[in-house]
């Protein structure tokens, strides 16, 4: 298991034929050896699983990954009734460069993002070791 910083950018689609590097997410997640979310570590330290949403219109938000029943994952921003973006099959996705991730926005529109970087986050690894000491 390793803590990883992941950059997702909007993939090509009808509204953005070339995709967009200005629309995306920066994620800090624990990944297993197959590049998938390490759910057991998430359960221990959910507060370290952070999301930074970036948009062209400067509607940037910071939030956390949340898990509901089954394989229902969301990006949550703030209060319990605040914006949530649904993540179909999030627990099954790999987060390796070139892989694709789907995000359903708060209006129910499906957007596809491509993993453009996935690098170790040693600071988070130290936080984890400190938390378990």
Q: Can you annotate each of these PLM segments?
A:
Residues 9-11, 28-32, 68, 76-78, ...:
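A structural detector for beta-sheet-dominated domains
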Residues 5, 72, 100:
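Exposed beta-strand and adjacent loop surfaces of beta-rich binding modules
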Residues 35-37, 47, 52-57, 119, ...:
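Glycine- and charge-enriched low-complexity intrinsically disordered segments
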Residues 1-42, 50:
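N-terminal intrinsically disordered, low-complexity, charge/repeat-rich segments that act as generic
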Residues 76-129:
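Short, compact, well-ordered microdomains
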Residues 11-17, 51-52, 60-62, 99-103:
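Intrinsically disordered, low-complexity boundary segments flanking structured domains
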Residues 43-96:
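Short, conserved turn/kink motifs that form compact alpha/beta structural patches or helix kinks used as
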